[in-house]
Amino acid sequence: MNQFKATRISSLIAYLFMTLCPLVAIAQSGGTSSSYSRFGLGLLNDQAQGWNRAMGGVGVALPSGSKLNTLNPASYAHMDSLSFILDAGMSGNFGHMSMDGNSVNVNGGSLDYVLAGFRLRKGLGLSFGFKPYSTINYNYTTVDKEAYRDVVTGELVRNTTNYQGSGGLNQVFVGLGWKPFSNFSIGANVGLLWGGYDHVMMQNFTTDGESNSHFDAFNFIQHADVLTYKLDFGAQYAFRVSPRDWLTIGATVGLGHKFDGETFLYRFMTTGDTLSVDGEKDGLDIPMSYAGGIAWQHKNVLVLSADAHYQAWGGCRIPAMVIDKGNVTYPSTDRMYKDNYSLHLGAEYTPDPLATKGYFKRVKYRVGVSYSSPYMNIPQGTGGLGSSTEGPREFGVSLGLGLPISNRYNNRSMVNFGMQWLRRAPGTQSLITENYFILNLGVTFNERWFMKFKIQ
């Protein structure tokens, strides 16, 4: 029996890792389209899963039981001894961008996570999987309001600039959660962070809508390749406040450090001639991060939870293109970032988890809200080291359902469906306001692999 279990587990782990590469390609091919992904490391991906995205992204104080919770690795210690959990999720988004009376609609989709976990022994749980860390995906064009006079023909010339970007960072991780004594658990996630980005800026000078050959435009490509580690620690403590009520507190810490990566700036003319290549090694950082949470559970019917997150982006560096009197440089700077924080509130209600009749009595009803301050500064003009303004704040409202999948052997697998409204609102009218409607779909397979059957 033990040999059968070990073979089954090792075979599934091998299969999951073999399928990981094409899944990563799918994740990189889509994602939210946003002009703000041009700055910093792009849009930071929501690290919550389908079930807790519908609860506003809470999870620091929530344990893993019949589902995985990667927001706090200490939660893995609470996994059931009979279960192997496989969790996967994807999302589709429909966005509306507006500025100065102009607007455009965008849409996209992405694979958000593929995770697995099981209990190794009493009080010790293991989880591993794939989750994107950041996404870069944009393509937009600006036209200068003021025209220039062609010194040869005397005609008015306008400068049109196209900005395109793609890429992002992905992570694979493995984590352990351990419960050294009753009601207290600790854990750690160790991850590999890799990826890169390309930011392209192409200029074109036109006269009456046609290209003007008397102007040679400067064009730029910013390229980066990244390979580094990510390390996060967590703890949870639960105590009973009444015969039917539990209160859990949780905390996490993520280590900040320099990236092992290289970044390059390519500068070339419209004719295709390369003028210069400027590089920066180890010029990227990720921040120290801290989170705390509290959760109250009434029987198995009602859960209320609140989280607060803080990331020290203000001291992190990233190379920035600086144009000063015709001179182009590409130094690393910490002026592109600012410290950010986020707040999350969520609730889950299950009318009767043990109901044998009435399917909707076992459905989990979820709702949540969230707020996040910006982690990026938006440069004004052409200088990455000059004046800047804050990036957009994010406001979110979410709701969803956990729909049980039941059969004679298993009643803990679940389809998690959620809807989110997300608004990115800048502090100035000169920047773009974004509104998104997001559909999340996740499936949690909770299979009883380690149950012993008696054969008669």
Regions found by a protein language model. Give the residues of each.
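Bacterial Sec-dependent N-terminal signal peptides
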Residues: 1-32
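Membrane-interfacial loop-to-transmembrane-helix junctions in polytopic alpha-helical membrane proteins
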Residues: 3-6, 63, 163
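Residue-level detector of alpha-helical transmembrane segments in integral membrane proteins
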Residues: 12-16, 66, 280-281
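N-terminal, post-signal peptide beta-strand-biased segments of exported outer-membrane/organellar beta-barrel
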Residues: 26-134, 339
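Outer-membrane beta-barrel porins/channels
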Residues: 28-54, 119-456
